[in-house]
Amino acid sequence: MLNPFKHKPALAILTALTGAALVYATNQFAFAQNAVKNTAQQAINPIICRVVGIADGDTLTCLTDAKQQLKVRLHAIDAPEKQQAFGQQAKKHLSDLVYNQTVTLNITNTDRYGRTVADIQLGSLNVNQQMVKDGYAWAYQRYGGSRYIQDEKAARQAKLGLWRDAQPIEPSQWRRMNK
């Protein structure tokens, strides 16, 4: 009679190797899927859509011609949170600029919350840059906002928007303080 437990160590090793291979293959598939997703986003650039909602000073909702809703985070800027000083003003300013307007999205990526991250054009106007110029957002250097540093400095000197506050708090710092 055959002993089914005779090769237990070999079976355990085979099972472990199979499991490791499965984990590796799954990770490679996920990596490839993200690469394809990012490549696909780049391929469909630019996207033209109508702004149908404003969440805050750096997030809006857009409706494409195919009736697809996109939650869009403005690339390279950081506006005050809604509960933060100048948060409501930043939201209103973005709304005044783009609500119910047809805009062009130049997608850069997708953020950890699943939002499309994009530079937004309204005709020849770079909306992201305009929010910084008008003093309703910081140049988000961590995410490519260094191109807007001069606009931020000019808004600070002119005391525009949030720069009227004697000591404005960056949204990232405000979020840490209000966890």
Predicted segments, located by residue:
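Small beta-barrel nucleic-acid-binding modules, primarily SNase/OB-fold domains
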Residues: 1-179
